Each structure stands twice: as structure tokens, then as C-alpha cells.
Design a protein with these regions (language model features):
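Phosphate/nucleotide-binding beta-alpha loop and adjacent structural elements of enzyme active sites
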Residues: 1-267
Length: 267
């Protein structure tokens, strides 16, 4: 029997017989551990498969190299999958800033940082926007706690969160923008607003992994082309994974295609 089958049986046992509220999933490459709300899809995949978002995670683990003093950003950190993965790649003198506005996700992120002794990570309980303001975070169901969004939604409850402009926050935190080399952004269609307030640090970022959900953006009143234009004007070009390989992609393909994770690299 393979791992997924065995872990799936265990998951059903813990969820429906023991009625556990939280579980611990173990990542199978670096031995990382993640506490998660038992219904949540991110944690379920880690628990059953020992991995999450395989293509992007493997790309990061195999291709991103940090030097002493480098900095990475995780915007929409959720329970910490990418932040803690980045921590394994980062020299002792490096830093990761992990932004997560949702109270439950932030609590789990903080626990997982301690669980993995990931001392390079600074967990920040704030959202990222184009200006400093109070925003409503629209909550998705417990089945996918990573689907919360700052884009207006008619479904689900909301919680008020503090949003900051990324450039301003980093400068006020005395972060050397020139040392920021990598960023991951996954905030359910709000990426354009977040990166509109990051034009200074984008000059230094060499690789940006960014979720792209054109239909959700349009529903929330955002033109997906604006995000593409913003990043291309900063010297980035987009690629996506196809059959395990990183392939270049056109704007038209992105605009007319499904949701995907884009790897933006500098020309």
C-alpha cells in the first residue's frame, strides 16, 4: 500500500472517529512539520502526500539560492508551507518576512515556525495592500483556509484586518530592500493591489512566484492585464510549469487560461 492510501485512512480515522480539530502533517523531503485545521485542504495534502503544490515547491527548493544576508517575502503565508521551506534554504544570516492577516492561519503559522525551529522567519499579522488601511478579509469555508480574500465577496463572513503598504512597511522596519531577492504572493486575486504598493522592492526581487486567478480578479473588479503590465514594466517575464518543466507563456495565454502559479523572472 502506498503512502497516500495509508495516510488517507489515518486522516478519516482522526477526523470522523476521534473528531480531532487539528492534525500534524509531515513533509517528506526536509522532514518539516505542519499543524493544520483538520478540514483544511493545504494541511490535508501535506498529511496525505508529504508535499504541497509539488511543481512550485520543487522549483523553489531546487532553483532558489540565497546568499548571506538575503531576504525573502511570503505574502499570504497561510500556515507557513513556503516560509518554512524557504527557511531550510536560507543561510543563518538571512531572513523571511511572512505576512498572514487571518487570525487562525496566523496562529498556526506562528506555531509551525516554533515547531520547525525556523528562527529566520518574522511572522507579521497584517495584509498587504496598496496603502495602509483597515480592510475586510472575506473568509472562505474551513475546507480551504487559503481562499480568504480582500476582494469583495457575497459569500462567507468577514473579519477586519490591518493592511500595510509593502514598501513602507519594509522601510519602516529598516529592511535593506536591495537584499530582498525572492517573493511568493498568493492572496486570492488581490495581487495587483499588493504589488502596486511594492514598486520599490520589485526593483530588487529576482524571482517572484505569484498566483494568477483572472476570473476571480475580474469578479472583484480587477483587470488581470494590469498585474501583467505592472510586472512586465519592472522587467519580469512570466513562465508556468507544463509537464514538470518551466515554459514561457504569453499574456494572452494567461488572460484566457485557468488559474495558475506564475514564476516571474527578470530578463
Amino acid at each position: 500500500m502506498n503512502r497516500e492510501f495509508i495516510q488517507s485512512i489515518k486522516y478519516l480515522f482522526f477526523r470522523f472517529l476521534l473528531r480531532r480539530q487539528f492534525l500534524l502533517g509531515k513533509e517528506n523531503r526536509f522532514g518539516l512539520k505542519f499543524k493544520f485545521k483538520i478540514e483544511d485542504v493545504v494541511g490535508r495534502r501535506i498529511f496525505k502526500l508529504g508535499k504541497y503544490e509539488r511543481d512550485i515547491s520543487d522549483f523553489v527548493a531546487n532553483n532558489i539560492e540565497f546568499k548571506d544576508g538575503d531576504i525573502a517575502l511570503d505574502i499570504g503565508a497561510n500556515i507557513g508551507w513556503y516560509s518554512i521551506l524557504l527557511n531550510t534554504l536560507m543561510p543563518e544570516s538571512g531572513q523571511i518576512y511572512a505576512f498572514e492577516p487571518d487570525p487562525l492561519n496566523f496562529s498556526l503559522l506562528s506555531e509551525n515556525i516554533l515547531l520547525n525551529k525556523a528562527g529566520n522567519i518574522h511572522a507579521v499579522n497584517k495584509a498587504i495592500s496598496d496603502k495602509k488601511e483597515s480592510k475586510k478579509l472575506y473568509l472562505y469555508s474551513n475546507r480551504n483556509l487559503g481562499r480568504h480574500s480582500l476582494l469583495e465577496s457575497e459569500q462567507g463572513d468577514g473579519v477586519d484586518v490591518e493592511a500595510v503598504q509593502l514598501d513602507q512597511y519594509l522601510l519602516e522596519s529598516h529592511v535593506d530592500l536591495s537584499r530582498v531577492k525572492f517573493a511568493k504572493v498568493d492572496i486570492e486575486g488581490y495581487e495587483f493591489y499588493a504589488l502596486s504598493g511594492a514598486t520599490k522592492v520589485l526593483d530588487y526581487i529576482e524571482c517572484l512566484v505569484c498566483e494568477f486567478v483572472p476570473d476571480r480578479m475580474r469578479q472583484g473588479g480587477v483587470d488581470p492585464q494590469d498585474l501583467i503590465n505592472l510586472l512586465e514594466n519592472k522587467g519580469f517575464y512570466p513562465s508556468i510549469h507544463k509537464a514538470g518543466q518551466l515554459c514561457s507563456v504569453t499574456s494572452a495565454e494567461l488572460l484566457n487560461g485557468p488559474a495558475c502559479d506564475i514564476v516571474w523572472l527578470k530578463r
